[in-house]
Structures are given as structure tokens and as C-alpha cells.
Amino acid sequence: MTHLTQLEIIIEKAFDDRDSINTTTKGEIRESVEHTLSLLDKGEIRVAERQKNGQWYVHQWLKKAVLLSFRLNPMQIITGGINGTHWWDKVPSKFSGWKEDDFQKAGFRSVPGAIVRHSAYVAPNVILMPSFINLGAFVDEGTMVDTWTTVGSCAQIGKHVHLSGGVGIGGVLEPLQANPTIIEDHCFIGARSEVVEGCIIREGAVLGMGVFIGQSTKIIDRTTGEIFIGEVPAYSVVVPGSLPGKPLPNGEAGPNLYCAVIVKRVDQKTREKTSINELLRDETQC
């Protein structure tokens, strides 16, 4: 039996008996939860992993470990803010106790105002502008997390992703069966866009400014008429749009309903050679 399998068994059993767990709980359960969160924090394990077939496998027991930590940890003063600012919370800062050597080894840039909670992993060459990374999240190498962006609990952000200013990536710990929101490698998410409810943005996709995608959002390919729910195909260029509404009872035209529109699809080489503005400008002016 592997070490991770042992941890999983302990966490699963503890979660089934979670009503008996509180801030006074000691021993194996507390040690297992704390160790699991430490492994998440270091990026040695992650809540979701992409399989060879392109599907994502979610380790539900890791989400359960995060939830158990809220029962185990009391409210306390959290230090580490700018100019000695502190908070009242159950989750310490990822940077608690860090010194220059720790930041050097981590290899990412964190500007003043960036908040990362313990158990979130940030890979080398990531740039964190003033932003918020919630617990259990995974931000892979070379990604830009721009100003006022939020990366929700257990969200998975790929390599060389650009999350523009004010972007919201949804978190999902409850309901427990829900999957985390996933942004795959080389995606561009435009300013003030939102991706939530376990939706997946596939590799190389471009979302223009102000695109909102949840599990009820219709994502319509303008060329083929195909409708996607919960997933944007790879190398798609997506902008906000609307669908004609049903007529009102009095026969008048009903209000249009929001949708997201795939205005074009490109191959990997075109995506690499073409600027984001060029990809969006040509089609949105039609």
C-alpha cells in the first residue's frame, strides 16, 4: 500500500465521520490532513489530473481533506499582509514564515497585494499581480495572473495561461461531487470574464473580454451551429453573444438570452503566430 493510498483511506474514513471532528481532534486524522495540504501546497499532488485520453480525473479525497481542515483549524490571526496587515481566518497564508530563500526556490513573482492561501500551488515563472489564489488551486508554470483576478478553490490553471484583469475562475468544494474549473495550457482569458461551475476551457482557446461561462451557458459555434455546454473546444476563439428569446405571452418579441459564440477555430501554429487582438478583431467586426 502506497503512502498516498494510506492517506486517502484515513481521509475518506474521517470525512464519513466528520461530525465528530473539531478543533480538539488530534493524532492520525489531523496529521494526515495537514500532510495532505502540505503536499498540495508543494505541488506534489493535485486535485485533478489530465489523463492521456484528454479527460480529467478528480481526486475527491483531496477535496475532502481541504474540507476537513476547516473543522480542524480554529479561527486565528493570520499575519503576512502589507505594512503588518492581518486577518481573522482558519487558513494561513502560503507565504507565512517565508524568507528570501523561500521565494528564490519557489521561482515565481508575487507583487504586493497578491494573496495565496496555504495548499495552493504556484509553479515557477508564474507572475502574480494583486490577485487571490484560493486553497487547493494549482497554477502551472509561466502563467500570468493579472490584477484583481481570483482563482477559486481547487481550480486548475495550465501552463502559459494568461488570466487578464478582473477574471474570475470559480472554486468548487461543495457540492463535493462537482468538478473543479479547469483552464488548460496556453489559454487566454479576457478581462472581466468568468469561468465557473467546473467548466473546462480546452488548450489554446481564447476568450474575449467579458465572456461568462457556466454549466447552463450555451456555447455556439457560429460556423457549424454546434452547441457545447460546460466545455470550450481547443483553439476556439470565443466572444459574448445572445440568442433570440421566446415570444412573450402578448406576442411581442421576448428578451434575448446570453450565450457565448465561437467565432472561429484555429490550429496550434496559427494560435502561436497570431496576436490575441488579431484573432478577436477580424471576427467581431463582422
From Swiss-Prot:
GO molecular function, one term: 2,3,4,5-tetrahydropyridine-2,6-dicarboxylate N-succinyltransferase activity
The keyword Transferase appears for this protein: yes
Gene Ontology biological process terms in this record: diaminopimelate biosynthetic process; lysine biosynthetic process via diaminopimelate
Catalyses which reaction(s): (S)-2,3,4,5-tetrahydrodipicolinate + succinyl-CoA + H2O = (S)-2-succinylamino-6-oxoheptanedioate + CoA
Predominant place of localization: cytoplasm
UniProtKB keywords: Acyltransferase, Amino-acid biosynthesis, Cytoplasm, Diaminopimelate biosynthesis, Lysine biosynthesis, Repeat, Transferase
Pathway: Amino-acid biosynthesis; L-lysine biosynthesis via DAP pathway; LL-2,6-diaminopimelate from (S)-tetrahydrodipicolinate (succinylase route): step 1/3
Residues the entry annotates as binding substrate: 109, 146
EC number of this enzyme: 2.3.1.117
Assembly behavior: Homotrimer.
Protein name per Swiss-Prot or TrEMBL: 2,3,4,5-tetrahydropyridine-2,6-dicarboxylate N-succinyltransferase
Species per Swiss-Prot/TrEMBL record: Bartonella tribocorum (strain CIP 105476 / IBS 506)
